[in-house]
């Protein structure tokens, strides 16, 4: 809340999560309009990056931004448990990561960010559509919290 007034200057939030997994696959989860999703997908295809792009929420640092109306693109490298991803547990070890994998993620995230920054006209609206807002609200349990406050 201390920086809430600064959000008006943010057109999109880019978040990277779980990068570096050796055995895995790259995805982008867009919390934004269908146009924002299509833009990200077209960019990845045009540049030849093998990144699966979908419009859906993702539990990460982008949620507070989306909750305030700032669209977000989450870049994630999901892994497989055989030589892959163990998250927040005793098997969450650096031996399952590689510099090459981190460099690959870094490159397409950087390229995408540059595309947005250098656009003379921003390529999609600064909108989180209603259906995405509802999913974010459900994730944050806003309805349940409001009802709990009423019951007090």
Task: Please give the residue ranges for each predicted region.
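His/Asp/Glu-rich mid-to-C-terminal helical/loop segments that flank catalytic regions of hydrolases
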Residues: 82-151
């Amino acid at each position: 809340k201390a920086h809430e007034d600064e959000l008006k200057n943010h057109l999109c939030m880019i978040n990277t999560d779980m990068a570096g997994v050796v055995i895995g696959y790259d995805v982008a989860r867009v919390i934004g309009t269908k146009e924002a999703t299509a833009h990200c997908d077209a960019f990845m295809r045009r540049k030849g990056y093998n990144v699966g792009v979908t419009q859906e929420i993702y539990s990460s640092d982008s949620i507070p931004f989306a909750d305030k109306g700032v669209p977000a693109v989450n870049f994630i490298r999901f892994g497989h448990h055989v030589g892959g991803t163990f998250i927040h547990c005793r098997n969450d070890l650096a031996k399952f990561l590689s510099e090459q994998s981190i460099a690959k993620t870094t490159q397409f995230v950087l390229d995408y960010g540059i595309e947005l920054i250098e656009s003379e006209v921003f390529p999609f609206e600064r909108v989180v559509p209603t259906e995405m807002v509802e999913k974010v609200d459900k994730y944050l349990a806003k309805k349940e919290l409001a009802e709990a406050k009423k019951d007090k």
